[in-house]
């Protein structure tokens, strides 16, 4: 295919939350295809400023050459839980990887809980995914990314490659955390894979002032009880806590992320997480 022929979609969704009238409001939204959102749900009467929003895909996943973005802005004092309706499939990409960039800004005393379901890498899938988080003083956030692989034909065919990037900085531009990871599908599935026998991977950052953070042992134990192998440690520059999860499959990984995120949610909000149907 000639290089000058564009393939894939170019779209960026924008969600802006503000505090007003004793609650949080989705005051700014731009949700082009293939994105779709539900109306905000209010699941915590004791904390009316905390709302829940489901982000959905109308297209069946990420495809060759896609360039999709998600911008989330939390205004001062606002609080939101943004999640997905289901896992997102990344389809065969050939020589044009799909790209997904998430940019998050959390203002002073705001809270964001953004724990999407795993990205499922099909055979031949190539993906580059980045997450950039900007924090103002007093901001709190729980943000995750996760991948699993699946061959619908059951032949064990690997994905092509995946690249993950994370950046966390202050509103003044000071870098707190920066990391990148890359692995080819053949390495991921190899007998000497750096993941050992595990076939799903997740990462979560729990960000906020030190007195608000959960007990690391409690978070790790909650994830381990689901069948995951979890490890948690402080992030550089006192940014918060960083969790890594390994799991045998995407379902176990999702359960581990939910368990760990629930402990983080409770510590940062003082509330037990409400059941969210999917």
UniProtKB/Swiss-Prot annotation:
Instruction: Tell me a GO cellular component.
Output: cytoplasm
Extract one GO molecular function annotation from the record. nickel cation binding
* Record's subcellular location: Cytoplasm
Q: Per the annotation, which location comes first and is thus the protein's main one?
A: cytoplasm
Question: Which keywords does this chain's UniProt record carry?
Answer: Chaperone, Cytoplasm, Nickel insertion, Plasmid
Record flagged with keyword Nucleotide-binding: no
Entry annotated with the keyword Glycosyltransferase: no
Q: What does this protein do?
A: Required for maturation of urease via the functional incorporation of the urease nickel metallocenter.
The entry sums up its family as follows: Belongs to the UreD family.
How this chain assembles, per its entry, is: UreD, UreF and UreG form a complex that acts as a GTP-hydrolysis-dependent molecular chaperone, activating the urease apoprotein by helping to assemble the nickel containing metallocenter of UreC. The UreE protein probably delivers the nickel.
**PANTHER family membership:** UREASE ACCESSORY PROTEIN D
* Name this protein carries in UniProt: Urease accessory protein UreD 2
Q: Species name for this entry?
A: Methylobacterium radiotolerans (strain ATCC 27329 / DSM 1819 / JCM 2831 / NBRC 15690 / NCIMB 10815 / 0-1)
The UniProt gene name for this protein comes to ureD2
